[in-house]
């Protein structure tokens, strides 16, 4: 390899291939083909071996905080890479892990390869994945992110100025160097070759339906929705950079700290994070620019950004609390809360008592970005409402990585940890909460900021327009969808035919006045992404520690989900109609018939009720529910042996109420009995006096057949426990609700941006070769 490539490589020996068919470029963190050292290493090696090159890109479900937002950005990047690869005549194959396609695609591909060349990533799980592939074939990791390669320097420093002093000579030498042109001539791949998996055409998926149908098959977090106005890919990234280079860079030194001016910074961090643009290109352009703004931009790129990457390369477990300096950790042990503690979910939903902090959090939730100057203040905020500083740091990292398009990155790791003392010095005298760690009072920050203008963009609705959404059904799926939409800045109205929040999660009151669960006795099947929500409900006392059983009953959980929402009880929707603008609902309300228009309607009623309602709009859904009889009455003092298919549970504080549940088979046999008759049958079958007994028939207790995915047709979407998986569970209800909301934010279409991502390249003379 020429020196400018060789210095960027870390080699992992592995078994040689008995008969190699090609070289694999495993594209995972540098999603571009122009000015990409990994690509250049791969094609140089392929030429030397006389082999074709295959570019493999995988979008996995197992990366931290995998979500619709991050997946969508990655799919756009993949579409851009595929477009450029076709121009270059090189085969690019994309594997998206999803239902029916979770095979070890890369391992199988590596078995056919001579060597696997990939981007250097110092974080887990990517490091572990590198090791797994190295057991199959030799792997070469290439630094495609830094101006000064990590294999050349790769050391941390306790302060940024020390890193700057240690690297300034090399940075000065490198920052203006054009990237050498790679002139490798590659052997063509056989037209008959097929990859050991079914490749995905990302551009086709985006053009078809905004990748909605593809994302529906991925086990990822749908509650983190795609963002508007930020398209992944090298061409989109370079178009953004070209605009900023021409119009904003010269003023960067004056505008970069004004968070109210969203255009005052380049906003390039999401594309830099994914390696969709080359840091070497941006640095070279800024060096040629020669303005004071460019000088400050170079300082950010070559000191703070590079320092973070070299730090993550040098230390184990870059996220770990023990990397915070000893003086800071000792200081934190002697601090105390000033404000009342708040639940983590309140903070995630921007419900603190600080206006600036809330505005910043809403901005990253809705738009996937946060102004860096505010991020330094925001990052020091969570510890104001959490007793344990280490837990506060973990939550801050979690929020940043979950929502920010530039999260899960050495820069964001270092940025969050700086808020807790990393790369900083002590400040005395100690403060009550922050101790000796640098303070950034949000009130002071807000005072020097045009807060109204800042909130104007951070608190704007997610997506391309503010939606007016109607939701039919106020159960778990309906209320969860409503809360997500409301948190994203949309207008939402929930219509429920009952007097209060209940539905199939309803309760009753035992003879001693204690409420007990009449509807679904447990909530289960939670998707992994919902763990933080379930934990929140446990901590608030709605669910038992197992996350499945109510502490008392489940309607209080529904009431909690409906807090602050426009929920209209006793509003029965009896008709749907598509309109040119969206959808119209026909409603029977306490004040008489109504007709209400919405941009979109989510139908969240039980399956059979949804079917009948949807047919009024010409929409047909298939499915079937099972029935369940529940009866209750005074409990005897003695034990009772229940008949087959009957479950007996004593309820109430004095256990004086006996609840009887019949399984679906037993319930179906008596389905058409009247309620009073069934109460008598149950009591007498148990040998008890029927006085004081009552019964309830759940004709549609739980779906057992259904689509198991959200159904969309025009302005209508159908959600609930029949429209998710596992069918018939609370998890399915929650998952379908979140996916329907995410789908509303998936814009349809994709085209490469007109500004080319191709770098101005040169020969090796500038590198002394």
Predicted features along the sequence, with ranges:
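A conserved short coil-to-beta-strand element within the FAD-binding core of flavoproteins
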Residues: 569-584
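Glycine-rich FAD pyrophosphate-binding loop
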Residues: 486-511
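Glycine/tryptophan-enriched, flexible segments
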Residues: 156-313, 317-322, 453-456
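N-terminal Rossmann-like FAD-binding beta1-loop-alpha1 element of flavoenzymes
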Residues: 466-495
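FAD-binding beta-loop-beta segment adjacent to the flavin cofactor pocket
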Residues: 507, 696-724
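Trp/Phe/Arg-rich N-terminal binding region typifying the photolyase-homology
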Residues: 1-186, 293, 362, 381, ...
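Flavin-binding catalytic cores
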Residues: 663-701
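Central helical "cap/lid" subdomain
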Residues: 502, 591-643, 688
């Amino acid at each position: 390899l020429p020196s400018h490539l060789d210095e960027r490589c870390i080699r992992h020996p592995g078994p040689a291939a008995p008969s190699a068919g090609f070289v694999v470029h495993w594209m995972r963190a540098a999603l571009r083909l122009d000015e990409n050292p990994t690509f250049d290493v791969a094609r140089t090696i392929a030429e030397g071996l006389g082999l074709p090159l295959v570019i493999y890109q995988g979008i996995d479900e197992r990366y931290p905080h995998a979500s619709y937002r991050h997946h969508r950005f990655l799919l756009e990047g993949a579409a851009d890479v595929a477009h450029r690869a076709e121009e270059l005549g090189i085969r690019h194959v994309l594997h998206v892990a999803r239902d029916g396609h979770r095979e070890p695609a890369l391992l199988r591909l590596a078995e056919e390869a001579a060597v696997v060349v990939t981007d250097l990533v110092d974080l887990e799980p990517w490091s572990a994945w590198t090791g797994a592939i190295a057991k199959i074939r030799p792997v070469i990791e290439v630094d495609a992110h830094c101006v000064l390669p990590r294999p050349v320097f790769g050391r941390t420093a306790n302060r940024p100025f020390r890193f700057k002093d240690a690297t300034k000579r090399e940075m000065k030498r490198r920052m203006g160097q054009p990237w050498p042109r790679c002139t490798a001539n590659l052997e063509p791949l056989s037209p008959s070759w097929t990859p050991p998996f079914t490749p995905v055409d990302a551009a086709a998926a985006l053009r078809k339906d905004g990748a909605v149908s593809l994302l529906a098959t991925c086990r990822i977090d749908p509650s983190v929705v795609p963002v508007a106005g930020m398209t992944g890919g090298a061409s989109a990234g370079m178009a953004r950079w070209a605009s900023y280079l021409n119009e904003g860079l010269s003023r960067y030194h004056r505008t970069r700290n004004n968070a109210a001016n969203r255009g005052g910074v380049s906003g390039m961090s999401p594309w830099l994070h994914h390696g969709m643009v080359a840091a070497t290109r941006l640095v070279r352009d800024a060096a040629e620019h020669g303005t004071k703004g460019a000088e400050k931009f170079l300082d950010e790129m070559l000191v703070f950004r590079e320092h973070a990457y070299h730090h993550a390369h040098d230390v184990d477990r870059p996220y770990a609390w023990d990397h915070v300096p000893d003086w800071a950790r000792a200081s934190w042990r002697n601090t105390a809360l000033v404000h009342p503690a708040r639940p983590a979910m309140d903070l995630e939903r921007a419900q603190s008592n600080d206006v600036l902090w809330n505005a910043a959090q809403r901005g990253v939730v809705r738009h996937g970005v946060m102004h860096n100057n505010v991020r330094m203040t925001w990052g020091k905020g969570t510890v104001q409402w959490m007793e344990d500083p280490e837990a506060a740091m973990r939550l801050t990292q979690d929020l940043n990585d979950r929502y920010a398009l530039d999260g899960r990155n050495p820069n964001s790791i270092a940025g969050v940890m700086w808020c807790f003392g990393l790369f900083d010095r002590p400040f005395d005298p100690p403060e009550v909460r922050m101790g000796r760690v640098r303070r950034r009072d949000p009130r002071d920050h807000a005072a020097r900021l045009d807060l109204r203008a800042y909130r104007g963009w951070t608190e704007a609705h997610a997506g391309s327009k503010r939606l007016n959404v109607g939701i039919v059904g106020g159960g778990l799926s309906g209320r969860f969808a409503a809360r997500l939409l409301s948190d994203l800045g949309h207008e939402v109205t929930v219509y429920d035919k009952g007097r209060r929040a209940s539905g199939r999660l309803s309760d009753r009151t035992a003879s001693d006045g204690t409420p007990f669960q009449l509807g679904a006795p447990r909530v289960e099947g939670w998707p992994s992404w919902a763990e933080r929500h379930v934990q929140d409900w446990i901590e608030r006392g709605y669910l038992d520690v197992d996350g499945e059983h109510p502490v008392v009953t489940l309607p209080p959980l529904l009431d909690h989900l409906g807090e602050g929402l426009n929920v209209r009880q006793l509003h029965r929707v009896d008709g749907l109609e598509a309109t040119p603008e969206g959808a119209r609902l026909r409603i029977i309300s306490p004040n008489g018939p109504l007709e209400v228009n919405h941009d979109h309607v989510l139908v969240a009623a039980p399956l059979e009720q949804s079917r009948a309602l949807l047919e009024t709009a010409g929409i047909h859904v298939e499915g079937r529910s099972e029935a369940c009889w529940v009866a209750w009455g005074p409990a005897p003092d003695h034990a009772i042996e229940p008949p087959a298919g009957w479950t007996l549970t004593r309820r109430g504080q004095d256990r004086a109420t006996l609840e009887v549940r019949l399984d679906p088979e037993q319930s179906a046999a008596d389905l058409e009995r009247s309620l009073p008759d069934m109460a008598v049958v149950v009591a007498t079958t148990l040998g008890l006096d029927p006085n004081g007994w009552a019964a309830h028939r759940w004709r549609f207790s739980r779906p057992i057949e259904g689509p198991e995915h959200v159904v969309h047709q025009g302005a209508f979407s159908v959600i609930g426990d029949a429209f998710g998986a596992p069918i018939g569970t609370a998890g399915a209800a929650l998952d379908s609700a979140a996916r329907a909301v995410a789908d509303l934010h998936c814009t349809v279409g994709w085209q490469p941006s007109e500004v080319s991502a191709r770098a101005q390249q040169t020969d090796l003379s500038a590198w002394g070769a």
